[in-house]
Design a protein with these regions (language model features):
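N-terminal signal peptide c-region/cleavage motif recognized by signal peptidases
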Residues: 18-20
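Alpha-helical, heptad-rich or low-complexity scaffold/stalk segments
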Residues: 24, 33-127, 136, 188, ...
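N-terminal leader/linker segments that initiate helical-solenoid repeat arrays
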Residues: 24-84, 131-172, 318-327, 331-333, ...
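Helix-turn-helix repeat elements of alpha-solenoid scaffolds
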Residues: 29-32, 57-66, 93-99, 140-144, ...
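Structural signature of alpha-solenoid helical repeat scaffolds
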Residues: 76, 110, 154-155, 190, ...
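Catalytic glycan-binding domains that act on GlcNAc-containing polysaccharides
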Residues: 86-90, 99-115, 121, 186, ...
């Protein structure tokens, strides 16, 4: 009933009053908070063993060699002794290790990742042959999750460098007419592919200046060229025609863009917008067909949005992310698995990750997905991402590995939806706690020094004493920054605007409030953001957010809102939006 009412409101383009949605029965905060303390794998070490190995690895790091020797002799057959011996033998400053000790190690440690290096060392110490080690299968790229990427610029020599710079300067100075005049003087000498690129760039410049008739006219000429820029030109033509309320032309060019798109994201976006245009033209059958095609790729924001609008259940892509009892039964016999778990128990995450990845390359390829879920259970987010993007022949990681969810929280507790924070982190730093950008943004959520100074007082800390690379501290500052953006009068709590502000800052966001001609339509706002980076950022972070909601098997108020032309609001700490959805007057 409610969905039908919202759809009718969208179809007639009416201004709708705020509607109250039933509070969702599931939330992301409960799921991700529970994971922090969840014991997902059996403990491998006793309390005494954990204490022993912590002191042993600390002694190795501190180059206390006499103590290392003594402690190694105390537990010669311990689960982590071979790893510790390898770290000791291969340390740059450790005492010389002779051949008998190396050969002894190779008899028990041949399945460890250090075996190849120790085998080479044994040859230098006089071994007559290389050790017989397990075959380490090479990994192959598995590709990445789809994202909207701009086609590569055509560099075939037909566009002179000085003319390129001059046209781009006109575009950056909000002078599309000047850019078109320059292009007109060189257009005939461009290659077909270069012609498509530069006509598209000028067409987009007209569009972001709200010169829709000029944008449409220019974009319609892009098809005279060739290559991947043609689909981008058709996309601009569709958007410009939409804003001109020419649904027939918009539908035609969105369908052209979808047919020619090399990017799954552009294809899904064009199909979705084509469906909107067809519905505006009162062509429901065509609209449904295009929407169904868009929904076929649930890895994209628009694919998930189309499925939501159709009422389709999304496939189980990331919903079964947790390490299961069945997973444990399939890998528990592998000694390296037990070693990786034990290393995680004593805080040796880097070594644990190395052992786990090595096992993934020497073990049964059928266990690769289970091992990727084990990486999640052990809180190895970067290992998860590596396994998502790389796998030996015949193996494939769990798709949820593209969306790690580490067992962390801000030092002052979660105040925002953890799924939203993770969605930003994945794009900002790929969960690298020591990441630093060229602009000196730092840590998981890429916090700048000025942001530290801005929020330190409200967090009750001294800016000069903050270790922004500490994940719990970084999360607290990132969370506070999101809250500040939520409360800013310009964003009015609108989630897409807040996402854009996190990337671009409030200065352009405030300017865009009057510059972006979106008719109150949130999707049109997202597609008309002038900055390419920010436009892509919002779409990617929104996609990430929905994937994390799916991972938690939680409902998605923001996806429901956008599917009904509503502005999704910033969620509360539980992932809910307090039941509020503000409807736009922007069309279908």
């Amino acid at each position: 009933m409610l969905k039908n009412a919202l759809t009718l409101c969208a179809l007639v383009g009416a201004v709708c009053t705020p509607l109250s949605l039933k509070a969702q029965e599931q939330n992301t905060r409960t799921y991700f908070t529970a994971r922090i303390t969840a014991q997902e794998v059996p403990q491998q070490l006793s309390s005494d063993e954990r204490d022993h190995y912590r002191r042993l690895f600390s002694a190795i790091e501190g180059e206390q060699w006499a103590e290392v020797e003594a402690m190694l002799s105390q537990r010669p057959g311990g689960l982590l002794t071979d790893v510790a011996r390898a770290e000791y033998y291969l340390h740059a400053n450790s005492p010389r290790v002779e051949l008998p000790a190396l050969l002894d190690w190779l008899r028990s440690g041949q399945n460890l990742p250090q075996a190849e290096q120790i085998g080479r060392l044994s040859i230098t110490r006089g071994a007559t042959s290389a050790p017989n080690l397990p075959y380490v299968r090479p990994t192959q790229s598995q590709g990445s999750m789809p994202r909207r990427t701009r086609p590569s610029s055509i560099d075939d020599g037909t566009m002179p460098a000085e003319m390129r710079s001059a046209i781009l300067e006109r575009i950056s100075n909000d002078d599309p007419f000047g850019a078109r005049q320059l292009l007109d003087g060189i257009d005939a000498s461009l290659s077909s592919a270069a012609r498509a690129e530069w006509r598209q760039r000028v067409a987009w410049s007209f569009f972001i200046e709200n010169l829709d008739a000029e944008a449409l006219a220019m974009a319609q000429t892009v098809g005279a060229g060739s290559g991947s820029w043609v689909a981008e030109g058709d996309w601009v033509a569709g958007l410009a025609a939409w804003r001109l309320n020419d649904c027939q032309t918009a539908s035609e060019y969105f369908q052209r863009s979808a047919a020619g798109a090399a990017s799954p994201n552009l294809r899904a976006a064009a199909l979705y917008w084509g469906s909107r245009a067809a519905m505006r033209c009162r062509q429901p059958d065509l609209s449904t067909r295009l929407l169904t095609n868009a929904a076929s790729d649930d890895r994209t924001m628009y694919g998930m949005l189309a499925a939501e609008q159709l009422g389709q259940r999304l496939p189980n892509r990331v919903e079964s992310a947790d390490f299961s009892q069945e997973d444990w039964r399939s890998v528990q016999s592998e000694r390296n698995v037990r070693i990786a778990i034990a290393l995680a128990e004593i805080g040796q995450d880097n070594l644990g990750s190395q052992v786990l990845l090595h096992q993934a390359r020497i073990g049964d390829p059928r266990n690769y997905a289970a091992l990727s879920r084990l990486a999640r259970a052990l809180d190895f987010p970067q290992t998860q991402l590596f396994m998502a993007y790389n796998a030996p022949s015949g193996a494939q990681a769990d798709p949820a590995s593209h969306f790690p969810s580490p067992k962390i929280a801000p030092y002052n507790g979660w105040r925002v939806d953890p799924a939203l924070a993770f969605a930003h982190i994945l794009q900002e730093s790929a969960f690298r706690p020591n990441a630093t950008s060229p602009a000196n943004a730092q840590g998981l959520m890429q916090i700048t020094p000025i942001t530290v100074r801005q929020h330190a007082p409200s967090l009750g800390v001294s800016a000069s004493q903050v270790n922004i690379y500490d994940p719990e501290i970084n999360l607290a500052f990132g969370q506070r920054n999101l809250e500040m953006l939520r409360d800013h009068p310009t964003t009015r709590g609108r989630l897409p605007v807040i996402m854009a502000a996190y990337n671009a800052g409030m200065t352009p966001i405030t300017r865009w409030e009057s510059e972006i001609r979106d008719f109150g339509d949130p999707l049109l706002y997202m597609e008309a953001i002038p900055y390419w980076e920010t436009r892509g950022y919002v779409a990617i972070v929104m996609r990430n957010y929905w994937m994390y909601e799916r991972q938690a098997n939680a409902a998605s108020p923001s996806r429901m809102a956008l599917a009904q032309n509503g502005w999704p609001l910033f969620p509360d700490g539980n992932g809910l939006n307090n039941g509020r959805v503000y409807m736009s007057a922007g069309g279908n």
